[in-house]
């Protein structure tokens, strides 16, 4: 089996899509599956090893962290003709994904898509709600011809089904429980950041409107004084609202910037509660990372995160976009530290059952089934030629 993957976001960009695809390519290498990956080139001096095929790109004006690819269709077509893929996976619906779609449709090749981001909800945060109907019209066109559309959670699958999408399949997400583990809890984290408060609250993610970061900021500012003295916040990440949030944050908030690998895993394990207000997630990778690290999770009952957290067992779920709801739960946590530990333990047990290996092997089986079904579909068309 030979696969061609198309994505408009990849490393060194840090987001759920790029990290998932990086893990997928690693798994394909382990399984000996030939593949190419077409992705944006972040800088002219960057070098890329096989199987990555970098495409010239420029910063996206609305979100400079993201890249807008400027693909050469002729060059991509030459690469694909030489490679002869059995299936194309279009991970994003933008310029690079469109190149894959054009090639697949032109040659009648098996192709699948994956839905990673609720862009319709993002548009509302950037005062572009009026174009949501146009967005859905485009998305339905993009996904219409594919042999399967993969969604990362049942919540996302249901929302796509409600929009009329067909041939939907679940492609969930896994977690590296050796990297993210409670064993990495370290007092050095508190020493490094000068933390003396008994309860360490953690947020990991982009500092951006679509993450409902204003809810987090208001909860930080409006916690009662008696509670403020007992908690410290670590905010891990970067984004367009970071400067504004720094100015508004109380003194018990530390901003670390982006963290990766072992350093990030240590931050997770050394916190006491993961606080995540985003209502726009299709899955919520950081929530699963927190659970694997033995952290209880305080999040909202909207988006893919609600499929991960069981209230009272692995964390707490509150109404979205409500700073008061977050404040109430954080205040209650102060009195019941043992309950937090118990929920963190149960979250760890859930995460242990979600290995990337089993999830990617399931995806590969889906690929193989789609390729085989496509071959059978061609038989009736070829019979008159026999």
Feature map (PLM): residue ranges:
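Short hydrophobic beta-strand element within catalytic cores of glycosyltransferases
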Residues: 296-299, 309
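Conserved acidic donor-binding segment of nucleotide-sugar-dependent glycosyltransferases
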Residues: 310-312, 316-323, 332-338, 352
């Amino acid at each position: 089996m030979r696969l061609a993957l198309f994505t408009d976001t990849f490393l060194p960009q840090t987001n759920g899509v790029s990290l998932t695809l990086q893990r997928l390519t690693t798994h394909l290498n382990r399984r000996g599956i030939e593949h190419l990956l077409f992705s944006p080139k972040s800088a002219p001096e960057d070098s890329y090893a096989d199987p990555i095929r970098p495409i010239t790109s420029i910063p996206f004006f609305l979100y400079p962290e993201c890249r807008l690819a400027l693909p050469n269709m002729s060059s991509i077509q030459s690469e694909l003709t030489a490679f002869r893929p059995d299936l194309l996976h279009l991970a994003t619906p933008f310029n690079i994904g469109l190149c894959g779609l054009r090639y697949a449709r032109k040659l009648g090749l098996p192709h699948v898509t994956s839905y990673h981001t609720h862009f319709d909800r993002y548009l509302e945060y950037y005062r572009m709600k009026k174009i949501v109907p146009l967005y859905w019209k485009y998305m339905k066109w993009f996904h219409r011809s594919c042999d399967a559309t993969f969604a990362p959670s049942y919540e996302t699958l249901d929302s796509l089904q409600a929009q009329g999408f067909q041939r939907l399949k679940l492609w969930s997400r896994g977690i590296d429980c050796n990297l993210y583990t409670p064993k990495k809890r370290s007092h050095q984290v508190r020493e490094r950041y000068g933390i003396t408060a008994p309860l360490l609250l953690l947020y990991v993610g982009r500092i951006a409107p679509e993450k409902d970061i204003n809810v987090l900021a208001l909860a930080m500012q409006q916690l009662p004084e008696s509670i403020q003295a007992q908690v410290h916040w670590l905010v891990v990440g970067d984004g367009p609202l970071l400067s504004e949030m720094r100015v508004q944050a109380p003194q018990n908030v530390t901003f670390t910037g982006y963290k990766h690998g072992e350093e990030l895993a240590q931050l997770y394990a050394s916190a006491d509660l993961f606080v995540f207000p985003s209502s726009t997630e299709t899955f919520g990778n950081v929530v699963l990372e927190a659970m694997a690290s033995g952290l209880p999770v305080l999040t909202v009952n909207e988006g893919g995160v609600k499929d991960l957290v069981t209230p009272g067992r692995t964390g707490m779920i509150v109404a979205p976009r409500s700073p008061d709801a977050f404040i109430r739960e954080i205040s209650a946590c102060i009195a019941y530290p043992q309950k937090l530990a118990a929920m963190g333990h149960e979250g760890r047990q859930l995460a242990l059952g979600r290995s990337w290996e089993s999830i990617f092997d399931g995806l590969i089986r889906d690929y193989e089934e789609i390729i085989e079904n496509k071959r059978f579909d061609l038989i009736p068309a070829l019979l008159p030629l026999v």
